Structures are given as C-alpha cells and as structure tokens.
Amino acid sequence: WWMSVVRKERPEMTTRGLPKGLGHNPSADKFVPEELQRMIEAYGNHPSFTMLCIGNELGNSNFDIMQQWIKSLQEKDPRRLYAISTARKIMPADQYMVTHNIPQTGGTYGINGSGTDNDRESIYSKATIPVIAHEVGQYPVYPLWNEIDKYTGVLEARNLESLRQQAVKNHIEHQDRKFHEASGALQTILYKGLIENLLRTPSCAGFQMLSMTDYSGQGEALVGWLDSFWDSKGIITPEQFRCYSNDIVPLARFHKYTWQTDETFKAQIQV
C-alpha cells in the first residue's frame, strides 16, 4: 500500500521522485563518489573485494554521471569488476551485470517446460560480460498468525494483522497452518527448479535472491523460508537446501516428470 499513498510527513516512503536519484541530488552526488574512492583505498587489497556496484535498481538516477564515477574507479584500481547498478540499465563501462533481463535478448531466470532438460544458455551465451540473475524466485509462503506475537515494544505487525483480518472475514483464519505447509512445499519445489535451471546454464555467472528471510520493508514480502526474525518456518532444513544450492550439485536432465509404466526412464547426468 505504501507505493500508492502519498505521505507528506514521510517522503522517503514514496518512490515517485523522492528521494531524488543519484546525479539529481546535490548532497548525495558529492558524497557517493568520494565514498567510493574511500572504499577502494581502505579495502582495495582485501582478497574478497572482487566486485563493486554503486547500488541496487537505481532507475531514477543519471546513468551518464554514475558511469563517470565508475570510470574513475576503473582507472584508479582496475583489479576488480565494476558495475553501475543492478537491473534497470546496462552501460558501456559495466564489466558485469546483475539483472532480471538482458536487453534485446531475454529474461535471466524462469522455469521452462515440464521436465528438467532445459536451461537458459541461449540467452546467457549472447552476453559479452558476466551476467548474474537478479532477485530470483520471490515465491511467497502463507503466514502463520502466531508470528504476530513476536512483534513487541515499538514493533507492530500491521501487515500481518491486515492479512489475518481478511482471513477472519473469509472464515479461513484457522487454516493458516495448512496453507503455510502447502505453500511452503510449493516454494521449495519452485526454488529447487529455478536454481537447478541456472546451474545447468554454463554461461550463467551466478544468481542472487531477494532474501532467504521475509522482507517487511515494503509492506510485506513473504518470500523467505525463514521469517523476518530469521527463525525457520519449518519448510526446509539447511541440509536439504544445500542438496540443490551448493558448490557442487548433481543434476539430472529429463524431458518430463510423469512417466508411464510401459516407458523407460531416461536421463542425462550433469555435474
């Protein structure tokens, strides 16, 4: 709801021009390039500092100005890969991209077909720089109403309270556990299928999720297998998750999930 309501006392709660994007914001435009310079001076020799991106989905910013900042960093310290923004726009100075979509090419993630004999190599292979799939998945899980009790002190779960009132109105409040388990099982299947699809794509440089926890900063995004307090929802264990998201994952390619008794199951193994 916060995107549709103008709140004069809280301008940061609307994306319609507030706050102004980089390149249009004098105070930030002075701070950000100076801070970027300080970052590479302070952490430039750290072995984990392999990539730098100015920010996330900077769609309301001036990409030409930000590109100048990136070029300055590349000239000063070319030891890592640089990018201007995740998603939104790809610029000539970008040395990698984190995006939902490769321009004029196609989407970076999705589940295709009725089996596992598929990937997104036809899209990724056309890119001239490494591509990381951005905020993949985001499959929601029906909430448990007892999570509301965790919000104490200055915290109130108004988003969950609103959803619970809808459930009360529709006489299904008592079914939250069943809906939670069913949607959680579906979430696991979808994440597994999506991640394995990316792992089957040789040219995919990686993927990132919105969050493994629920995100309550925009009303609600119940997309995690952990809740907003980092507590397990009881959907999946770490050991189970690592079976399909790990350094090495055995994969099986087969063209359909349903086989008849008179058919011989065939699959191609990929690691």
Where are the regions that the model predicts?
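Substrate-binding/catalytic cleft of secreted carbohydrate-active enzymes
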Residues: 1-226
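Aromatic-rich peripheral "rim/lid" segments of glycoside hydrolase catalytic domains that contact
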Residues: 72, 76, 210-270
